[in-house]
């Protein structure tokens, strides 16, 4: 299901990251009283009154400065393009500035719902000052205090009221997957071979595919949507604005995918950039399949696949759950296995385990390995329940979450994998204090 997207934008140092953290109720964005701290967009899922949505935090928009400021503005412009609803955050202490007016004009041209929020309205006198912001022409300003939380509920009410009408429920039946990787590993060729036609421009130049292209297709009665992304370059090589857009669109494709195919090049082996690319998908919590393309090129023997697989497992230890598929876009070798493997991973990441079964597993796990002890205090595990899917997320109720050592968390994840088929999907464990 594609969730509504909400973007928080504004000039530097008005409290966007603090508002972002307040809405998602956790500190994900770096917050510092210094303009330009948030350079990249931060994504997180949020929920208000039963309405789930994707929230984007952006860096401060400015038309002054140098290359870094231009890149930050490009990031924000992409967020604006992706958003269904835009929150323009201003600061009552600064009053209305020329920069506020320029940003307001930019947002007005989008023809999208824009909600004007005035931050740092911490007392009645400051709340009276918000009337100056009517001059921006964006409707009624909403006074908020990101740091204290006042007015956030009113803001969220307004946000969900502006969400677009829900799309046809048939969209829920479509399995979305994207192919990611550094440039020139053959992603576009894989898409064309998979679809049986030239949908994406293919050339032997890096960066041929600038945009991410969504293409629906049906295989064995199952509906899929494949997103072929522009190759992700090493950060030091991202100079042109168009290349910056390519990286941003690839990130967006990952966010919009159920399953991500990490494409490696068998002819060049694993590069450092492959690890960065894999990290994007892993951190997003998406299902992952490792696809080794150009398997027709290197000289091989009977042990070549096993040797390459060992190298993959060594270099991508955090992706030990991801299946590996050796293919050739040129010859078509094993391309027909991609849809069924995507469907298998999708099913695995959406399965639910009954709480009674999970607690039987916990009991058996406690007999295998004792719970950790820190400073003379032992972790006590009471029960476990699954709270969400895609990725499978489990809450473990304990006496003190601080006692949940990462090694024991990993042990519980391994127990889940041994007892249930979670091939291709990450698993999240969330320790919570029993009330």
UniProtKB/Swiss-Prot annotation:
Gene3D superfamilies: 3.30.300.20, P-loop containing nucleotide triphosphate hydrolases. It holds the Pfam family KH_dom-like. PROSITE patterns: G_ENGA. The keyword Ion transport does not apply. Keywords: GTP-binding, Nucleotide-binding, Repeat, Ribosome biogenesis. CDD domains: EngA1, EngA2. GTP 2 binds at residues 181-188, 228-232, 293-296. GO terms for biological process: ribosome biogenesis. Residues 4-167, 175-350 form the EngA-type G domain. Residues 351-435 form the KH-like domain. GO terms for molecular function: GTP binding; ribosome binding. GTP 1 binds at residues 10-17, 57-61, 119-122. HAMAP family: GTPase_Der. Belongs to the TRAFAC class TrmE-Era-EngA-EngB-Septin-like GTPase superfamily. EngA (Der) GTPase family. Associates with the 50S ribosomal subunit. GTPase that plays an essential role in the late steps of ribosome biogenesis. This is GTPase Der. It comes from Lactobacillus acidophilus (strain ATCC 700396 / NCK56 / N2 / NCFM). The lineage of its organism: Bacteria, Bacillati, Bacillota, Bacilli, Lactobacillales.
